[in-house]
């Protein structure tokens, strides 16, 4: 009977708890069996004196009753211990159960803060990259135009300078052309003079 009760209690507890707790229950059940055996021995010792005090005729019956009673008495006091043991067992089992469940919760919490840092890391690098990008862009834009502008005007000023002396050179030839045409006109005048001279020849011819 005791073994049946213990096995039933173990089955109920095992269904409620994990396999790890079953090992603990098995160890505790073995200890309970030892305690129950000791209780039975003590019960037999205590029950033997009463038959001696009873009448001799009832001694045989008392012996039989003792055997039966010992079984009943042994069962009765033995029942509470396993129940008590069962009540005591769950608390340690519960304590063991929640810690592992709490462990993953705590691990998940540190995991969350670990997640955002890597996200913040990629956000940080782009910021320094942005300032690096504009400086090179601004540098080439500012440098080439500055030297290019001063270089551009000097050559422009150079060609502008020569045309100025060229301009005076230009007008003189133009003036020469203007003066030259009147020169051929001058020979036209001598032609006219020749016409005037013709009468002189005429005078000679005459």
Swiss-Prot record:
Protein name stated in the entry: Acidic proline-rich protein PRP33
Q: Which gene encodes it?
A: Prpg1
Q: Where is the composition biased (Low complexity)?
A: 103-112
The cellular location(s) given in this protein's UniProt record come to: Secreted
Q: Where is the composition biased (Pro residues)?
A: 113-174
Region called 6 X 18 AA approximate tandem repeats, residue ranges? 80-189
Q: Which GO terms describe its cellular component?
A: extracellular region
sequence repeats (start-end): 80-97, 98-115, 116-133, 134-152, 153-170, 171-189
Q: For the region Disordered, what residue ranges are annotated?
A: 15-206
Q: Which InterPro entries match?
A: Pro-rich (IPR026086)
Biased composition (Acidic residues) is annotated at 55-71
Q: Which residues form the signal peptide?
A: 1-13
Q: Where is the major localization of this protein?
A: secreted
Q: State the species of origin.
A: Rattus norvegicus (Rat)
Keyword Amino-acid biosynthesis in the entry? The reply is: no
Q: What does this protein do?
A: May protect teeth by binding to tannins.
> Any idea which UniProt keywords this protein has?
Repeat, Secreted, Signal
Q: Mind telling me which Pfam families this protein's record contains?
A: Pro-rich
